[in-house]
Every structure is written in structure tokens, then in C-alpha cells.
Amino acid sequence: MSSLVMGCTQHKTDMPRQLVKALPQYPAYAAANYIKGRVDVKFDIGADGTVTRIEFIRSEPHHLFDEQVVKAMAKWRFEKDRPRKGVKKTFIFSPSAP
């Protein structure tokens, strides 16, 4: 079994409340090979409360976890009518010991 530890860095003080949150799946290849990773993203929150324009700032190992991060963030929902730009988030992937 693998676990996902998530840290968050927010540089906006008046963030809309997050209503729906989904965690990224741990990729099977990474879990089977006990690969750790980190993904830092910057994204916007649209007026409709959805996540838009995800930009990868850092991804280690390169692109291994990106797809799962995008899939999870596509499910996120925030309060409507409170758009924000340049919100930062860090995902830390750490496999469980065998």
C-alpha cells in the first residue's frame, strides 16, 4: 500500500473555500518500485469554482506523477464567484514500506 502526503503553500490570503477535494492516485509503477516524488503546481480558480490553467513548476521524477495530479485537481471545486490566479500547491508522494 502506498500513501500520499500533501503539503500546501498558499500565497493568497482570501482563498475561496474548497468544497470538493480529491487526492491523486499513486501510479502503479511508482508504487511497485517504491518511487518517491514531488509535484509543485500553480493554478487558477475560475469564477465557476473549477481549477483551470495548471502549470507544473517542479515535477520529480520528471512527469511521473503529473497525470494523476491533473486528474485529481479536475475534480476539485471551490466556492463560486471567487476567482483566483496563481494559487500554489505541493504534492508529496511517498510509498509505504513493504
Predicted feature locations:
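Short, acidic, Ser/Thr-enriched surface-loop or helix-capping motifs
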Residues: 45-46
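A short acidic/small-residue loop/turn micro-motif
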Residues: 28, 58-63
